[in-house]
């Protein structure tokens, strides 16, 4: 047997091994691919984006809270004034009493604030991925601005303005003396802009089988 014969057989063997690997992948695709293929999302994956928005909302809430804490400190206000106002929906006016210094309650207020942000994150991320996926950063920021302003108006003046007095006998959250309207709006805008900036973190990239690779 000549060297050329051996080289030819080795080349043929390499071809057969490659063919065997391809056939194994096809068998795997036939055995498991039907289920995977039916599950794989080819359109809009609402469950994924809602879950991703839940996580991204936590990040955005932390950023907006830090923005408010730093801003309040620079302005010579109580760093946790936002949380105190937030806690009036439950504790009433005593949450704003300077003598109120319950560390656990304030910590729980921060937790509830972040939890609210996680829920809002679902709304923001679903809308952004559904309607602003091809808009670029500037487009997403514009969408986030509109959503944030709409959420602020709806929550503060469409819901809280009448619900808090009804339940707790006061309207501290919409009282400009306690929380100026522009501070509340700016907090919502920072949340929305953060959602627009970290939007790529929550994009879905479907898994592709080896046989589907180009």
Regions found by a protein language model. Give the residues of each.
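Juxtamembrane/disordered regions of integral membrane proteins
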Residues: 2-214
């Amino acid at each position: 047997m000549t060297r050329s014969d051996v080289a030819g057989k080795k080349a043929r063997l390499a071809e057969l091994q490659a063919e065997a690997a391809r056939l194994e992948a096809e068998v795997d695709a036939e055995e498991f691919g039907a289920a995977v293929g039916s599950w794989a999302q080819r359109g809009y994956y609402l469950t994924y984006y809602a879950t991703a928005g839940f996580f991204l909302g936590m990040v955005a809430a932390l950023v907006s809270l830090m923005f408010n804490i730093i801003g309040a400190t620079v302005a010579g206000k109580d760093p946790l004034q936002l949380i105190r106002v937030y806690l009036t929906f439950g504790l009433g006016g005593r949450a704003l009493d300077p003598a109120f210094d319950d560390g656990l309650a304030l910590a729980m207020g921060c937790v509830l604030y972040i939890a609210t942000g996680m829920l809002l994150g679902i709304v923001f991320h679903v809308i952004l991925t559904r309607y602003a996926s091809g808009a670029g950063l500037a487009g997403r920021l514009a969408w986030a601005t509109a959503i944030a302003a709409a959420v602020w108006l709806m929550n503060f003046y469409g819901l809280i303005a009448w619900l808090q007095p009804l339940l707790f006998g006061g309207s501290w959250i919409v009282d400009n003396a306690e929380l100026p309207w522009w501070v509340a709006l700016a907090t919502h805008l920072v949340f929305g802009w953060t959602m627009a900036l970290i939007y790529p973190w929550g994009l879905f990239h479907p898994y592709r089988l080896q046989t589907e690779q180009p």
